[in-house]
Amino acid sequence: TANRIVSIDIASGDTHQYSFNNAIGGKAYNSSEILALNDHQFWVLERDGKGLGDGSSAKVKQIWSVDLAGATDVSDLSGQASLLGAAPSKTLVLDIKVALNAAGIADAAIPAKIEGMSFGEDIVDGGQTFHTLYVANDNDFVPGVAGDNKFFVFRFTDADLAAKGLGAFHNQVSSAPVPEPESLALSLAGLAVIGAVARRRKA
C-alpha cells in the first residue's frame, strides 16, 4: 500500500505530497517513523508486529531510504494504483533484526513494536567522527507484557552513506565524546546495514 509524505516549506507555506510504497517482498508493513537525512532523502522505519510483547519472533524490522528529489507530486492523485505508480524507489539502509541477531539478540527478544528513531550526537572514536542513530521500542506502558523500553544505538560514517549511494547527512546536533563503555559492538559487515554500535537502556 501507499503512504503519503507531505512536505511543507516553512518560509512560503507551499506543500507537496509524495507517495511511499511500504511493501517489502510484496507485503505491506507499518511505517512507524520517518527521519530527514538531508533536504531530499528520508529514512522510513518499517516493521511487522512480531517479537517481544507479542509472544512471537520478530521477522521484519528495517529502515529504508527514499529520495524525493524529482519525485512526482501526488497531491491531485488518488487510488492505490495511481499512488504506487508514482512512488519513487527505496533503498535498504539497515536491517535491524539482522543487526541485533549478529549482536546475540534472538528474534523473540527483539521488541515487536520498534517504532521510534532519531539521529543523536556525533561521536569521535579513535580520531574518527561517527554519526549516531537511536532506535527505540514502544512498550505501551504495560508492565510484564511488552518488556522494558530499549534503545539501540547505531553509528555510521559519511563513507557508509556514500557506499549506499546516499547523500550527505545534515546533522542538527553537536559532537560528543566516545561511546560509553557499556556500548555493545555489532558486526554488520556484508549485511546491508550501516551501524557498528548498539546500546540498550531501561527507561
Regions found by a protein language model. Name each.
Residues 201-203:
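Short, charged juxtamembrane terminal tails flanking transmembrane helices
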Residues 1-176:
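Sequence/structural signature of beta-propeller domains
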Residues 179-198:
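A short, hydrophobic C-terminal helix/tail in secreted or cell-surface proteins
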